[in-house]
UniProtKB/Swiss-Prot annotation:
Gene3D superfamilies: Enolpyruvate transferase domain
InterPro entries (UniProt xref): Enolpyruvate_Tfrase_dom (IPR001986), Enolpyruvate_Tfrase_sf (IPR036968), EPSP_synthase (IPR006264), EPSP_synthase_CS (IPR023193), RNA3'P_cycl/enolpyr_Trfase_a/b (IPR013792)
EC number: 2.5.1.19
Assigned keywords, A-Z: Amino-acid biosynthesis, Aromatic amino acid biosynthesis, Cytoplasm, Transferase
Compartments, as annotated in UniProt: Cytoplasm
Name this protein carries in UniProt: 3-phosphoshikimate 1-carboxyvinyltransferase
Catalytic activity, as annotated: 3-phosphoshikimate + phosphoenolpyruvate = 5-O-(1-carboxyvinyl)-3-phosphoshikimate + phosphate
PANTHER family recorded: AROM/DEHYDROQUINATE SYNTHASE (PTHR21090), PENTAFUNCTIONAL AROM POLYPEPTIDE (PTHR21090:SF5)
Family as reported in the entry's similarity comment: Belongs to the EPSP synthase family.
Pathway: Metabolic intermediate biosynthesis; chorismate biosynthesis; chorismate from D-erythrose 4-phosphate and phosphoenolpyruvate: step 6/7
Amino acid sequence: MESLTLQPIARVDGTINLPGSKSVSNRALLLAALAHGKTVLTNLLDSDDVRHMLNALTALGVSYTLSADRTRCEIIGNGGPLHAEGALELFLGNAGTAMRPLAAALCLGSNDIVLTGEPRMKERPIGHLVDALRLGGAKITYLEQENYPPLRLQGGFTGGNVDVDGSVSSQFLTALLMNAPLAPEDTVIRIKGDLVSKPYIDITLNLMKTFGVEIENQHYQQFVVKGGQSYQSPGTYLVEGDASSASYFLAAAAIKGGTVKVTGIGRNSMQGDIRFADVLEKMGATICWGDDYISCTRGELNAIDMDMNHIPDAAMTIATAALFAKGTTTLRNIYNWRVKETDRLFAMATELRKVGAEVEEGHDYIRITPPEKLNFAEIATYNDHRMAMCFSLVALSDTPVTILDPKCTAKTFPDYFEQLARISQAA
């Protein structure tokens, strides 16, 4: 297996222009494909997940052109639901941001489409979404294991009253919300359980509004969506920088700054993961907010005990930053780490122990006490981009770290290690 050894980093300083947000890129691509008119997306993320969405749109007959660097995309909207001529199979890798929204969108009208992906995708639950779509009339068959992909979709979604469990993944609700305006009837979506990752729902609602569709949000408990609507192209749309990707550079500055400034997001960003900067500030770093940037300057870091349900992806970065904080850090209410690219609670606990931390892994929390000195370790990444990026922070000590399968960052940030090197000074 390929590996990358990072030598100790004495200091980080500089500016990082963030690649486009994965969450925003894939939502915007699908809405542009469903909309009337031509949409130009700029600062689109070029990554594995986005390529899976683009390949699916190609197979569904959507026409678009990409710039040479794949960050500008002109899409000719379909002006309504997407249809396949005859039976079709779409391979979506391990891209949850493609699998869930497409599973819903392709239940409109009449289709016969199979959605499948990598082995890990077949372990990521989708039953709550399928249950909700079936309540709205969709015909969906599990081809292997009940409640997991691959799925066969045969259309039939008309709207009506649907319930969806909000406690596992906000992507199920996102998929229903994006699909509902194009259904023939009104849809009322009721949330069962506590809704996780609410800020990701705000991204969805924000984008739907940009594409001309308003819905009624009743305190995140119930959503009322009028049927028979259509999405309208906004013309040109700039994809925000990826706030989750910003977390690694901001954390690096908190540990070994200097000052690092990330551009492409700012105080008015729609992504909930910008709140990660508040956590670093609470730990002792200095944060400065602009309209299109966030900067972080080193401080003495102290441990925290916090509910991280609002920033589950960026919270992973706090787990490795905790290695540099005084005291024991506890991250709570993060059960949904277990249903991501890998079981992130298990993976994080296992790898933190390798570098010498004392770790308690609970059902939905993790407690981390750093060692006096970090151990050298080979870090397994579990084909999870965030594991690779989080553990790069270990090099901000006086100990090198080896990252196995470093190219797994291609899921969201193909040149992550080059960008980290650019702002780093060797010890």
